[in-house]
Amino acid sequence: MKKIGLLLTIFSLCLGCLGLVPSDKAHAGNLNLTTWPSASILAVESRTVNNADKKLGEIGEKLDLNNSPLRSFRKYRGMFPTIAAQIVDNAPYEKVEDVLEMPGLTEEQKKLLEANLKNFTVTKTADVYNEGDYRLNTGSYD
């Protein structure tokens, strides 16, 4: 039985390689590059934006004192982890200058914060960044 199966397989392969088995021709796609999709199709497509991306659009390049995770403060020398943890623990803030009124700041820490005030912004707290201690541990370990 195995020999019959083997012979049938070899015979089928030989016929297929010789082209004796009838088959349909392949149908190629339309490669005409001058045809563009109609404008009506493009107008229907919409882009959805999640809440986290929407908040990032509000913030821009600055670091949001009410919503940024602890690890984001690493890009400012001397801020991570001590001052950054104090900022996160004492949030929310009404304005950027409120960060200078945190309890327990040394004069050196105040000077460091004053030097970086231009890099900070304050927006309303967003649940997407503050629920579940996300600001303390974002889950990215680089």
Curated annotation (Swiss-Prot):
It is found in: Cellular thylakoid membrane. Keywords: Electron transport, Membrane, Photosynthesis, Photosystem II, Signal, Thylakoid, Transport. One of its GO terms (cellular component) is photosystem II oxygen evolving complex. SUPFAM superfamilies: PsbU/PolX domain-like. One of its GO terms (biological process) is photosynthesis. InterPro entries: PSII_PsbU. One of the extrinsic, lumenal subunits of photosystem II (PSII). PSII is a light-driven water plastoquinone oxidoreductase, using light energy to abstract electrons from H(2)O, generating a proton gradient subsequently used for ATP formation. The extrinsic proteins stabilize the structure of photosystem II oxygen-evolving complex (OEC), the ion environment of oxygen evolution and protect the OEC against heat-induced inactivation. HAMAP family: PSII_PsbU. This is Photosystem II extrinsic protein U. It comes from Trichodesmium erythraeum (strain IMS101). The lineage of its organism: Bacteria, Bacillati, Cyanobacteriota, Cyanophyceae, Oscillatoriophycideae.
